[in-house]
């Protein structure tokens, strides 16, 4: 098999790609992209099923902005540890495992068409099973659709020895139920705490680590087809600026390579779940290629250097980038919102988390991410607002713990007014423009 160019993510600073509005309240297990239709598919353990809870999972279909479109339920289908997405003549097929009845240490490889609102179980006729694939242990799949290859991870649950291996097949052979393995990658014992894996251009991306990296560090390890480790990096994304986790919980969940269907540019995506039980927050962070970074995050090309007098060590480097969005007023609902016609879908809608009016009568805009340093900020009202002599201003946060909360006050003439004052016309808009900076990881 011809090797393609390795995507080296180790010197790239990750950026938030999206926050996922998934169907269930449990921890994210995995995610995958339908690149042709610009959609994301996620898996979670299904809640509310009583004793079946730990053996069923839910698939959610979302937009690239992380907005939930629909979902389906797989009863007795395991945890949804990892899935593959196949676009077959316009129909999306899910590759997954299904537990074998009465054999808790074994599972079968299956694929089935995604159907919004459906519930499947082990007896559903929609499940295509692959009986000629000789899997004696539990299996987990991943797909490389560019090269039409299937990766099957197996692990030995009988002997408690943490043995895991991944076998690569031609996808069309697998669909035809033919057992023609191409090669196998043996996973070192110390990398057994799996949180996701993905196959791309002959390289296996292996994602490991436990909650808060307590016993096992959060690592991405990349293997080539010769069973050699070619890249490895510890992943620290998901901490806030004080190096804490939201509600002191952080768990790596899912990994996927996104390839722009038009340009071929790549982004390595990793999932992180944080927050308290019953209200988990699931986010995807991106290690973008330069081409994809330019498409998703408006940036300034020249990094900033932090220097303090004479330094014997290289100065810290900071990357300035732009955060900008438009807000529109709905007079009927008395709410400000990001207008659907006024944003870049891959960027702005992921920037704003929520918009409220706080106890001080100011508009409070909560962003998804904090920043290290605020370099510039301006708020500009449109003609409707200026015609009525309504102006806006904010309380600056130079950066840090509260930098994701933007508080905007309103004035009419010399009098302070509320953001939902009757003087504000329907469809009035304002533009918020900020230049901020984050530290460049090394």
Swiss-Prot record:
Organism: Bacillus subtilis (strain 168)
Record-annotated disulphide pairs: none
Function summary: Unknown. Might be involved in poly(glycerol phosphate) teichoic acid biosynthesis.
GO BP, sorted A to Z: cell wall organization; teichoic acid biosynthetic process
UniProt KW keywords: Cell wall biogenesis/degradation, Teichoic acid biosynthesis
Domain of life according to the entry: Bacteria
Protein name: Putative major teichoic acid biosynthesis protein C
This protein's record includes keyword Thylakoid: no
């Amino acid at each position: 098999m011809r090797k393609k160019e390795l995507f080296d993510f180790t010197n790239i600073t990750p950026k938030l790609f999206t926050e996922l509005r998934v169907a269930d309240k449990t921890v994210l297990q995995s995610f995958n992209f339908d690149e042709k239709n610009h959609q994301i598919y996620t898996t979670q353990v299904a809640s509310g099923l009583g004793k079946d809870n730990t053996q069923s999972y839910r698939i959610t279909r979302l937009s690239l902005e992380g907005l939930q479109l629909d979902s389906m339920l797989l009863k007795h289908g395991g945890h949804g540890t990892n899935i593959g997405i196949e676009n077959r003549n316009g129909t999306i097929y899910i590759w997954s495992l299904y537990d074998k009845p009465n054999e808790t240490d074994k599972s079968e490889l299956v694929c089935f068409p995604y159907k919004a609102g459906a519930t499947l179980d082990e007896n559903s006729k929609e499940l295509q099973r692959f009986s000629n694939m000789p899997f004696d242990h539990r299996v987990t799949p991943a797909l490389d659709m560019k090269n039409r290859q299937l990766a099957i991870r197996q692990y030995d649950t009988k002997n408690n020895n943490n043995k895991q291996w991944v076998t690569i097949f031609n996808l069309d052979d697998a669909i035809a139920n033919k057992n023609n393995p191409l090669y196998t990658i043996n996973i070192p014992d110390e990398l057994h705490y799996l949180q996701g894996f993905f196959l791309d251009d002959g390289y296996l991306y292996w994602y490991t680590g436990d909650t808060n990296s307590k016993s096992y560090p959060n690592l991405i390890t990349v293997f080539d087809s010769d069973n050699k480790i070619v890249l490895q990096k510890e992943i620290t994304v998901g901490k806030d600026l004080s190096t804490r986790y939201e509600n002191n919980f952080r768990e790596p969940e899912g990994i996927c390579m996104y390839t722009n269907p038009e340009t071929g540019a790549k982004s390595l995506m990793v999932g992180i779940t944080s927050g308290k039980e019953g209200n988990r927050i699931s986010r995807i962070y991106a290690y973008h290629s330069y081409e994809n970074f330019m498409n998703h995050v408006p940036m300034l090309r020249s990094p900033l250097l932090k220097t303090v007098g004479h330094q014997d060590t290289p100065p810290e480097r900071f990357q300035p980038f732009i955060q900008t969005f438009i807000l529109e007023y709905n007079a009927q609902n008395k709410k400000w919102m990001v207008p659907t016609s006024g944003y870049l879908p891959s960027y702005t809608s992921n920037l704003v988390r929520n918009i409220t009016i706080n106890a001080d009568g100011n508009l409070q805009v909560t962003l998804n991410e904090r920043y290290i340093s605020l370099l510039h900020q301006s708020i500009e009202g449109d003609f409707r607002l200026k015609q009525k002599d309504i102006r806006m201003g904010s309380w600056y946060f130079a950066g840090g713990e509260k930098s994701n909360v933007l508080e905007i006050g309103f004035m009419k003439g010399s009098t302070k007014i509320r953001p939902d004052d009757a003087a504000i016309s329907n469809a009035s808009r304002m533009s918020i423009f900020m230049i901020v900076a984050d530290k460049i990881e090394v």
